[in-house]
A protein has these predicted regions:
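Helix-turn-helix
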Residues: 9, 17-51, 55
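Amphipathic alpha-helical interaction segments
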Residues: 81-85, 149-153, 175, 179, ...
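Short secondary-structure transition hinges
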Residues: 95-129, 136-140
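Hydrophobic alpha-helical bundle segments that form small-molecule/ligand-binding pockets
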Residues: 123-150, 157, 161-165, 169
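C-terminal peripheral helix-coil segments that are non-catalytic and often amphipathic
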Residues: 130-134, 138, 167-208
């Protein structure tokens, strides 16, 4: 999605308003006022509030993808390093507010929720597949893994750690997610990758 600088400002402002006040409470008048434009000008970018919601959430996903890949490039780590960096990034930037807003969408705009969940799924699939191919190239992941299948399974892990209706939900979700991540890595790693993962774990235990 390629958008203009004006659209970036508008969608970013709107998304911050949704995070602060909630989806239902924010009106198009408030968005236009916060952006310093008229409501008529705002409607040059979108057709209605549901359209604005979809565009602003799509913008947020695109922005997070760009920032994440910049972080990974700056870190210069291998595929396993990247997985831990992705987990930290998601915890800091994407969980909490996004999950809460998706819940509000399901309640107030149920027709939008599946489309935006699909956007999130596509983003996770792309990041996961890129990571799998990088790890295979580096020799850290096994060469016989089925990228498409592993992507689906890993996405299932992510959803499982976000569900609110799990009967025996652990008190520490961070530990659950770390366990899930290590489980994922052990399932796809080569001997070289397992050795590297163990180094990370041992270093963490030593630091603690």
């Amino acid at each position: 999605m390629s958008i203009t600088a004006d659209a970036v400002k508008i969608f970013a402002t709107g998304f911050e308003l949704f995070k602060k006040f909630g989806i239902k409470a924010v009106t198009m008048e408030q968005i236009s006022s916060a952006c310093g434009i008229s409501k008529k000008t705002l409607y040059k970018f979108v057709s209605n509030k549901p359209d604005f919601l979809f565009q602003s959430f799509s913008f947020f996903a695109q922005r997070m993808e760009g920032i994440l890949y910049e972080v990974l490039e700056k870190n210069g780590g291998n595929a396993i390093d990247d997985l831990f960096a992705i987990e930290r990034f998601a915890e800091k930037h994407m969980r909490g507010d996004e999950d809460r807003l998706i819940g509000q969408l399901e309640q107030y705009y149920p027709e939008l929720a599946p489309r935006l969940k699909k956007k999130r799924e596509e983003l996770v699939f792309k990041i996961t597949q890129d990571n799998l191919r990088k790890g295979m190239k580096e020799g850290l992941y096994r060469q016989d893994i089925a990228v498409d299948h592993i992507t689906i399974l890993y996405y299932g892990h992510i959803l499982a750690t976000h569900e609110n209706n799990i009967a025996e939900r652990p008190a520490n979700l961070d530990e659950l997610r770390q366990t899930s991540l290590r489980y994922h890595i052990r399932g796809i790693a080569s001997d070289k990758g397992i050795q590297y993962l163990n180094q990370i774990i041992n270093n963490e235990e030593w630091e603690n």
